[in-house]
């Protein structure tokens, strides 16, 4: 039996593609060490995105492949996760205790943006990340309801300055709804709304988050511009439906984020298909393939396509979104895929950003 060497192990690893980074572990820069002791091989990999529900199966697949090498009787692959801080706007200082800010936005209301934001935050937490969600939809805050936080709940104040977020389902939650009467409408002009958003972002005592998901109000107005100019966003997720009108407004959202140099991580298509609960007939009530066309048009990824489902609505309204209510369901698995893709896209966006040139000034 011939002895195994490092090159042979690396060759095996290069044959397997991480489905979220779209690269093999070595090309993606995930390899940390290869230790060969006779016929035993130990490999250490490190992922830069939350993948708690994925990495054990991934490690087992790679381990079996390495054990297929001649000269190897046993192999062990350990995969750890280290989530780094990323931001698109270099000139904006980072938020205290927040590594990555993800904006969830839509061009128009009624497309399931808030439900997507809630399930994304919960899915990231299930993958092992430390997560918070900020309800920036100041005119129509709904995250308190979706996270099952009782009406009238108020955040504690720390050091007479900081709002302490309310924890629910393992996610830290902050919303303007916690500071106002639920029955009182927010009749505010743009500058007041923008100021309130900044106060919520900068004066909430988040506890060392890997990801802060911001549920944006629909449209392309003052709050979106404030976010781009004042908050260090890592990337945006655009939520739409296949309907032509929704896609038209979603395009405006994509264009807006691009103009302010915030990368669009991808598109989520809600209400893609309705499946009859009685006969199982599938019907595209709002059109077909709209999210895919939008993603293709702008060269971004279709991160998820979700059906029109009464359960998604009922579970969110009941304070336990699908990821919590039915964690093993097919729809919950789509949200987990979404979470892993979002985390991986942030890593890939950072890698694709060109470095600033080194400028040397001399007297020669």
Task: Label every PLM stretch briefly.
Residues 155-157, 176-191, 200-224:
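Switch II (G3) loop of P-loop NTPases
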Residues 318-329:
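C-terminal boundary of histidine-terminating zinc-finger modules
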Residues 101-138, 254:
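Walker A/P-loop phosphate-binding motif and the immediately C-terminal alpha-helix
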Residues 60, 206, 210-211, 217-318:
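Conserved catalytic-core segment of NTP-binding enzymes
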Residues 1-32:
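N-proximal, solvent-exposed amphipathic alpha-helical segments enriched in charged/polar residues
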Residues 174, 216, 229, 337:
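Glycine-rich phosphate-binding loops of nucleotide-dependent enzymes
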Residues 124-188, 194:
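Phosphate-binding loop that captures ATP/GTP phosphates
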Residues 27-30, 35, 47-105, 339, ...:
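Extreme N-terminal, non-catalytic leader segments
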